[in-house]
């Protein structure tokens, strides 16, 4: 039976951490460890983590940014399959890990992903787009793989080199592109997780910086040649113009 490590990075996550913990603890699949990497919380986050039932590990005062924290979590973990579920996110039902384990058991997949809903002030919203069929060229046009709904075999994660600590926002996108060059993933058009959108979340509070870093990652991985360069630059300019028209979350 495959074992799973769910890695949760936290920093002053008290308003949301209980829901995250409960969603992991409620999973019916038996072989799960929950690994917490805390960046030095000064609220009640650590106290809540220490009360977590089941198989847990935690480390505190981890510095160096979110990419480093996620890599530290992998080093601390022992599961055959790795997933990251941040302290303000949560699984949608108690069969998520059982479903994922079944897909791994019945395929040669090295990694897989499902879908997420957005949680805005407690209300859940499903995306208004269809999950595309996976291809590396499609992924290079834009990241459609949601980190809270992605699961990676340990061997594949280590072979990929882990998260780039030089990235603050697009470290997951960069990892997907490197993993895709090792092995294509299995994509499941099923909802696994909820991603909370609030002013304190890094990707929400710094949407423009995250967008620019996404583009830098895309340039890093795109094919050589003038045509790919012009194609991706055109996509970048179009999306940048659209992003400038969106209201900011306050």
Language-model segments: which ranges?
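Nucleotide-sugar donor-binding/catalytic module of glycosyltransferases
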Residues: 1-207
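Membrane-proximal basic amphipathic "stem/tether" segments
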Residues: 219-250
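Catalytic core of nucleotide-sugar-dependent glycosyltransferases
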Residues: 195-198, 204-229
């Amino acid at each position: 039976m495959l074992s799973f490590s769910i890695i949760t990075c936290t920093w002053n996550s008290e308003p949301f951490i209980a829901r995250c913990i409960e969603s992991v603890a409620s999973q019916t699949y038996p072989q799960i460890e929950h690994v917490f990497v805390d960046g030095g919380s000064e609220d009640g986050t650590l106290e809540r983590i220490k009360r977590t039932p089941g198989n847990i590990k935690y480390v505190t005062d981890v510095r160096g940014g979110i990419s480093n924290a996620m890599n530290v979590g992998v080093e601390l973990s022992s599961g055959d399959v790795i997933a990251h579920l941040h302290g303000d996110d949560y699984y949608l039902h108690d069969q998520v890990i059982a479903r994922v384990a079944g897909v791994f058991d019945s395929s040669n997949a090295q990694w897989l992903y499902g879908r997420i809903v957005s949680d805005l002030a407690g209300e859940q919203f499903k995306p208004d787009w269809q999950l595309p069929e996976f291809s590396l060229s499609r992924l290079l046009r834009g990241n459609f793989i949601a980190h809270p709904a992605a699961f990676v075999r340990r061997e594949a994660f280590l072979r990929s080199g882990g998260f780039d600590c030089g990235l603050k926002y697009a470290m997951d996108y960069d990892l997907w592109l490197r993993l895709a060059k090792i092995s294509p993933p299995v994509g499941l058009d099923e909802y696994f997780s909820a991603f909370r959108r609030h002013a304190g979340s890094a990707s929400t509070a710094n949407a423009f910086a995250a967008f620019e870093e996404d583009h830098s990652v895309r340039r890093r991985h795109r094919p050589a040649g003038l045509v790919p360069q012009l194609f991706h630059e055109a996509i970048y300019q179009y999306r940048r113009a659209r992003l400038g028209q969106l209201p900011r979350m306050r």
